[in-house]
Amino acid sequence: MNFDAAGSRDVRYNCLTVFGFNSRRRNRLRSQPFPASWLPILIRNVSYYERLSPADKQELRQTIEVFVAEKNFEGCGGLEMTDEIKVTIAAFACILLLHIENHDYYPRLRSILVYPHAYVVPEARRAVGNFIVESDEARAGESWGNGVVVMSWDHVLHRPTDPGGSGNVVLHEFAHQLDQEKGVATGAPLLPKTSMYHMWARILGREYKALSEAAAANRPTLLDKYGATNPAEFFAVATECFFGQAGQLKERHPELYEELKLYYGQDPARTGSTT
């Protein structure tokens, strides 16, 4: 449980022809006018957008256009896919990318599956005596290493803001996607500089240990206790808190806030939180 960075520098994109084609196509997408019908969706569902500088607003809009064009959105459980669903999810996903240099628009991600409400997964198992008991588990979202993100539209729209709440499911699952870019989620995404991994492991490892101890003792915490599950979940939960409760995180966990600020290149305690 040490936020291992092993494999983080093994990610390579060496097909130059495909890379050149993608770059040209993305540049064309970014140069297109942002659809007029999408802007009210941003303003209505993504309050963080209004707090951004004009340059960051433009960058976010351009990134959203590429994201929506490249990723496959599928409605599940009877949900009809709409621009509102696509743009809202894309906006929160692209907020994470806003100042990450040389990002590749979540290169492993192919599809986003969206259910109308929490969806049931019949995979939870637990041992009871000599028996294995299977039970259904309701989920709001999950990120798979094979290029799929699943989430509940109801949870995307209705984001609890209290410290004990589940936060922002899009930020959470796409933090996992960033963590999974190197192939396995360890709680250490691809950081801008190799020299950053030592401090990242030290600070996030210490904060993860503190959250685990607080969760075991049932003490109140700012960070969602689900982050005590493992380092990968801690990074996702910390990301939610960084963007959603930035001022409180900076005040109560200043070193953790600083590490996330360095990674994301954003200062939401100054800009304003996403919620």
Predicted features and spans:
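Metalloprotease/metallohydrolase-associated module, dominated by Zn2+-dependent proteases
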Residues: 29, 37, 47-49, 55, ...
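Short, positively charged and aromatic/hydrophobic N-terminal segments
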Residues: 12-14
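Short, charged early-sequence alpha-helical segments and their helix-coil boundaries
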Residues: 74-86
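Active-site recognition of the HExxH zinc-binding catalytic motif
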Residues: 165-181, 236
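N-terminal alpha-helical targeting/anchoring segments
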Residues: 17-39, 50
